[in-house]
């Protein structure tokens, strides 16, 4: 008999359905040579400080630091029934093997191992490692179970993280709370993130607005702008001088540019985009993606990869075809996917990028809750964008001299809309949601004429525009996630496996 332990009941039910296990018991299912049960999140956790010494019940400066040796573990009261069920199942004489089917990631590994050790189990165990809850993926995963020992390092890293969080959280929280006479929570990820927010708030508070002016010349239907001028009188004087002078092109160049499609979503990128477009918090996005994963409509969400493995090409082509037929904004679009640009096994870590699954073929999108449908559509749209052609344009930059001052005209001529055409179609369905962020002052003007060196314009029309410098924007969840992802990058070894503050999943907490 093989005992399969999932992370939660809904996942256990999906595994049972795929394996044909139908006989329901109290806290588990049985049939076809399988026992399938589940944890309820973290069944076994690191014990509270008071478990080590009675004196630790009271927060005091003299009791610090608290450094457990050896570490103790506990099962909280509300989870003891399910833990006992798992423990009894592990000890059944007909159980010869245990399968860790908790989420295929660091925390899932920790959840299983702590239960396994706390139950005193020494039976051999293997690892189910899948990126989709589709029946085909589950069956393939069980046919290719990995030896449990292959994930010993992952377990060690998870346990190290948990102990580090405990030591920092318990000791630093108690220290600062005692010193300041009120509860001040300190955390390994929480506190540096709070510092980012405080720094941004301080920058906004201390910001002093400055007004600047730009003189703009009409040169053959295009507009050439001066550098910033702080004094309004100087700007007006330059305007007057230009209108009595000649604007001469001193350099004009065009450059063919390709703007590559965006990469597929990892969790952090999905959270940022969902926050910017729909206002969802990072946790809401993770919860919605997890729900879609458990409904078999989305691949595993807790990933930091933005590519698919090389062997997923055919599957991705089929999914793209499904999306073209399912997503309303693709109606009438001319689209031939180039899936190859999304494939790179060398850039895939534990799990590939987030994409919809083949279950999309049977799904009634209209029947999904709106928030889940939004996330599924967002992930599907990103797959189509990523597989579309580059956005190709000629960028034109012309510099003019007028009244001993340089003016610059910039523009672009679009040659191939590529993925941006699909993005425009998608955004047109969002009903008032924000467009892509841009810098209004430096935005390229479409179809600027080509200028040649020496070309001149007599007495060009000129105008002065006034602008105010802008304070830093308050962090949104989207910008904060990006700041966390990039935190410390300049000081991190280029060969480091991971950078930034927290993991994609912990940033959602």
Where are these regions (language model features)?
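Active-site phosphate-binding and catalytic loops of NTP-dependent enzymes
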Residues: 23-27, 125, 148-153, 174-177, ...
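Amphipathic alpha-helical segments of the small helical/lid subdomains adjacent to P-loop NTPase cores
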Residues: 157-187
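Acidic, turn-prone loop/beta-hairpin segments
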Residues: 337-367
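Intrinsically disordered, low-complexity regulatory segments
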Residues: 1-162, 166, 471
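Extended, well-ordered alpha-helical scaffold/bundle regions in very large, multi-domain proteins
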Residues: 280-348, 509
């Amino acid at each position: 008999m093989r005992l399969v332990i999932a992370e939660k009941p809904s996942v256990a039910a999906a595994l049972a359905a795929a394996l044909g296990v139908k006989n329901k018991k109290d806290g588990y299912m049985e049939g076809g040579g399988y026992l399938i049960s589940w944890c309820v999140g973290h069944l076994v956790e690191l014990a509270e400080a008071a478990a080590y010494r009675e004196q630790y019940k009271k927060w005091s400066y003299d009791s610090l630091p608290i450094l457990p040796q050896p570490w103790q573990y506990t099962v909280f009261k509300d989870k003891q029934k399910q833990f006992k069920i798992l423990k009894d199942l592990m000890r059944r004489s007909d159980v010869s093997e245990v399968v860790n089917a908790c989420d295929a990631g660091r925390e899932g590994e920790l959840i299983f191992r702590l239960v396994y050790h706390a139950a005193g189990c020494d039976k051999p165990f293997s690892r189910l490692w899948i990126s989709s809850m589709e029946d085909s993926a589950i069956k393939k995963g069980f046919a290719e179970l990995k030896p449990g020992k292959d994930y010993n390092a992952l377990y060690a890293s998870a346990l190290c993280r948990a102990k580090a969080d405990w030591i920092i959280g318990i000791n630093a929280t108690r220290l600062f709370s005692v010193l300041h006479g009120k509860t001040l929570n300190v955390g390994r990820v929480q506190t540096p993130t709070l510092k980012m927010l405080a720094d941004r708030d301080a920058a906004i508070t201390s910001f002093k607005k400055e007004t600047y002016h730009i003189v703009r010349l009409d040169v053959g239907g295009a507009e050439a702008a001066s550098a910033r001028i702080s004094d309004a009188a100087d700007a007006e004087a330059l305007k007057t001088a230009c209108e009595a002078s000649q604007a001469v092109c001193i350099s004009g160049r065009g450059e063919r540019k390709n703007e590559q499609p965006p990469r597929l979503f990892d969790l952090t990128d999905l959270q940022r985009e969902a926050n910017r477009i729909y206002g969802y918090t990072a946790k809401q996005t993770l919860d919605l993606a997890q729900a879609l994963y458990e409904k078999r409509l989305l691949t595993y969400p807790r990933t930091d990869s933005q590519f698919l493995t090389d062997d997923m090409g055919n599957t991705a082509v089929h999914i793209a075809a499904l999306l073209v037929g399912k997503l309303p904004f693709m109606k009438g679009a001319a689209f031939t996917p180039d899936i190859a640009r999304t494939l790179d096994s060398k850039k895939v870590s534990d799990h590939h990028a987030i994409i919809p699954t083949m279950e999309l073929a049977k799904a009634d999108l209209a029947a999904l809750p709106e928030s889940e449908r939004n996330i599924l559509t967002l992930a599907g749209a990103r797959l189509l964008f990523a597989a579309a052609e580059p956005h190709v344009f000629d960028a034109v930059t012309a510099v003019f001299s007028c009244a001993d001052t340089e003016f610059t005209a910039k523009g672009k001529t679009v040659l191939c809309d590529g993925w941006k055409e699909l993005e425009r179609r998608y955004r047109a369905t969002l009903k008032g949601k924000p467009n892509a962020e841009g810098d209004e002052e430096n935005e390229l003007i479409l179809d600027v004429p080509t200028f040649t060196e020496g070309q001149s314009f007599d007495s060009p029309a000129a105008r002065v525009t006034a602008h105010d410098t802008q304070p830093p924007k308050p962090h949104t969840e989207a910008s904060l996630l990006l700041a966390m992802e990039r935190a410390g990058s300049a000081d991190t070894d280029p060969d480091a496996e991971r950078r930034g503050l927290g993991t994609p999943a912990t940033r959602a907490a």
